[in-house]
Amino acid sequence: MRRALLGTLRRTFRSGHDGRSDEPQPPAEPPKAFYLVGEPGYPNYGDELIAGEWLKFLAARYPDTPVVLDCARPGPAAVILRDRHPHAVFTDTLRRLATENPFPYDGPIDDIAGFVARALRDDGVAPNYACGIRLLQHDVQSVHVLGGGYMRGDWTCNLSRLSIGPWAREQGIPAVGTGIGLMPISGDSLDYARRCVAAFRSFTVRDAATYDALRADKDAAAVTGLAPDDCFINGLDGCYMPPEGLPDTMLCVQSDFVDDPAALYARVERTLERWNVGKDAGIGVVECNPRIDAPIFPYLRDRGYANLRFFPTVELLERGFPARPGQRWISTRYHPHILAAAAGCSGSYLSVGPDYYGVKHGAVLRMGSRWTQIAMTGESPMPGEGFADQGIVQRYRDDIRRSVNGIHPDA
């Protein structure tokens, strides 16, 4: 506002009292930036998918408005998402404030979040990041915390990013959150999240457990809604790899969050046998998190599976997700479940952690998947069907766009 006012005064002074002048006029002030908070850059496919889809949306609707995306690894994120928006800048201001402070990493939320809040108000609290803080203070028109599962109760450094909501309200900057999952969360972390969420103009979550936890507080309940995953913002247009040559059977099986990966892989192998997938059948192994999702490939190879194809993370990021109708999937991960089920694939999921991945897979079932769950004991089920209503993807797109009316009224 101050810069715009000064620009108006300068133009009036040059033009004289009648407001006319033959002199060239200075260029108009550039619009203030959309400020996004997310988690692309590790990479971990779903986070890049969500951030990339929002950047595509903003590039199509507001091509001349700059975007700042605040994430933990802005360097890799900038390269991965380099073609999504013509005026995107990547930074890690909030992440740095959350991790470079006097308190232990993932220590008490009130300590870490208190530091973040003080620094946002006074850049002298964190002078190394004063430029990023001042950008927030002076050059931002809205704040949008993107969806994902990167904030939860025990990841307090990540969770402290919600402090941007109360700060934005103090500054008169509209803030929204979309498609967020906070589970597992309880105690001080939940109290903190409720206080922060109440300051947002709107705040949608992707799972019922997060929804119920936030709505137990009346102020947070007033702005909290239950929504689909952010990946649907553009109706999944352009998210898939060309279907030609993709295997009929696909796996995405992680090794993190698992006490005994070998037992998990053995369970997957027994499920393949139950589904009559022979050792000469084509099987795709999808990696969403580099190295973390790869070990099942040598496990199956060593057991005689001879027609395996590996899909590394970089291929997904560059070419899209390898799902097509007619496939059968086994996945421990959340976004492969969403994208494959939405594409009409049948499948089953394994939950490697009931309070985290169990909540995630439950959210996909609510969104429309009919996949079956594979338990670690007993006979594996046959695969369940994907989304019954293919039109729901477009309705989800419209729902998400309506949820950001507070910052994009023409969305």
Where do the model's predicted regions map?
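Active-site anion-handling motifs in enzyme catalytic cores
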Residues: 1-411
